[in-house]
Design a protein with these regions (language model features):
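Cell-wall glycan-active module
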Residues: 1-65, 146-166
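Solvent-exposed, acidic/flexible segments
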Residues: 23, 27, 45-53, 65, ...
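Generic hydrophobic/packing signal
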Residues: 57, 77-80, 92, 97, ...
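Short, solvent-exposed loop/turn and secondary-structure capping segments
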Residues: 85-92
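Non-catalytic cell-wall polysaccharide-engagement segments
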Residues: 1-7, 94-166
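Extracytoplasmic/secreted envelope proteins and their assembly/folding machinery
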Residues: 27, 31, 53-57, 69-73, ...
């Protein structure tokens, strides 16, 4: 596999480094990134007094995590689209106040099974509210990929690192 074959406008971002960089991962940049999405700055994230952009920026910048807030936000947008999934509603019967923005553990053969498995994961990990769901998802991404040397989407998809296990 020659990565030079992917140096095209629609594929280049798979080589972006996913670790935090204070010089361009600013809170204002994350705010601008989220404009026009269901996570824009017009309202607080569910069950918190914080805006989504502040959550992504502050969680990504934490020293032990060091994850690009752009990557976290883009991953949520990829998983949640318009933001209408029961996995992030906080109102699903039996799972009130639990959220799973990254769809971690959300698998199954029916929509109902996918939702329940994802919300079971959120409940088991105490992801109550948007903040704790994003914090938990960021930790999964950091521990499972980035801290194991897979800090680009390319390296996550094509594991070429002998120290990584994914």
């Amino acid at each position: 596999m020659d990565p030079r074959n992917s140096l095209q406008e629609n594929a280049i971002f798979q080589f972006e480094q996913l670790t935090y960089n204070a010089s361009y991962h600013t809170e204002e940049a994350v705010k601008n990134f989220l404009e026009g999405t269901f996570m824009n700055s017009s309202q607080n994230a569910p069950e918190t007094s914080m805006k989504f952009y502040h959550i992504f920026w502050s969680i990504g910048a934490e020293e032990n995590r060091q994850v690009s807030p752009f990557h976290l936000a883009a991953r949520v947008l990829q998983e949640q689209g318009e933001g209408t999934s029961p996995l992030i509603s906080g109102t699903y019967p039996g799972y009130e106040h639990y959220y799973n923005y990254f769809n971690v553990g959300a698998s199954g053969s029916t929509n109902e099974e996918v939702i329940r498995n994802g919300l079971n994961y959120a409940k088991d990990h105490d992801w109550h509210g948007a903040y704790y769901s994003i914090l938990g998802g960021a930790e999964v991404i950091s521990a499972s990929y980035i801290r194991k040397g897979q800090d680009t989407l390319y390296l996550q998809k094509f594991n070429v690192s002998p120290t990584a296990s994914n």
